[in-house]
Amino acid sequence: MMDPCSVGVQLRTTNECHKTYYTRHTGFKTLQELSSNDMLLLQLRTGMTLSGNNTICFHHVKIYIDRFEDLQKSCCDPFNIHKKLAKKNLHVIDLDDATFLSAKFGRQLVPGWKLCPKCTQIINGSVDVDTEDRQKRKPESDGRTAKALRSLQFTNPGRQTEFAPETGKREKRRLTKNATAGSDRQVIPAKSKVYDSQGLLIFSGMDLCDCLDEDCLGCFYACPACGSTKCGAECRCDRKWLYEQIEIEGGEIIHNKHAG
């Protein structure tokens, strides 16, 4: 069994080290093997104090560097305005925007997080006077951008996996179990398991995220029981029910094709 990487140890998620969700290979890199840009992104996205001798496993490279943006499925909601997850028409916060907006609003925005049109409009309305000033940042060299970012005192944003499954964005999802009384869907018998011990649907073997998007790689905080980012309010392993539908920002209803 391989030892956990330094990132897993510091973030107290050693159970996730060397997983093969997003890569077929297992192993380590030392942080000095990363580019300066990747090391900076890792530092900002984890809130960790890093040194070149620290190690990162291939799984955490995927989570925090290679696929971090893809794994952000909803608006980061910096102003606490959303009652439901906003998942449409998102745009990524880049390094320059993270620097500028964090300083402007006095709250941490991490490169790779995403904003919805509503939050973008709030930001644009708040910083209109400084638009010219903001544009001047774009031509800056990577070195100056990195220096500016390093000068900011970021606190640990908290990994998505550090939160309890009932808190934060997860509680904003309105999920309907197919076992709900009066449901027009098939009711799963109380003693019948819908998911196997690995969290896969027994009848199809599918690794379906509780957001019901069949292409989703996982958009929830990691499950404290199994570590998967595809579990909603309760771990899918050996679960006896599944979600019939969810409602997302804008009132759109997504139905579970596998519930009937």
Curated annotation (Swiss-Prot):
Q: Where is this cross-link: Glycyl lysine isopeptide (Lys-Gly) (interchain with G-Cter in SUMO2)?
A: 177
Q: What does this protein do?
A: Through its interaction with ARL14 and MYO1E, may connect MHC class II-containing cytoplasmic vesicles to the actin network and hence controls the movement of these vesicles along the actin cytoskeleton in dendritic cells.
Task: Give the subcellular location.
Answer: Cytoplasm
Tell me which InterPro entries the record gives: ARF7EP_C
**Where, by tissue, is this protein expressed?**
Expressed in the immune system.
What's one Pfam family here? Answer: ARF7EP_C
Q: How does it assemble?
A: Interacts with ARL14 and MYO1E.
Q: Which organism is it from?
A: Homo sapiens
Q: Which UniProt keywords apply?
A: Acetylation, Cytoplasm, Isopeptide bond, Phosphoprotein, Ubl conjugation
The UniProt annotation puts the region (Disordered) at 160-182
N-acetylmethionine-modified residues are 1
Cellular component, GO, one term: nucleoplasm
- Write down what this protein is called: ARL14 effector protein
Modification type Phosphoserine: residues:
183
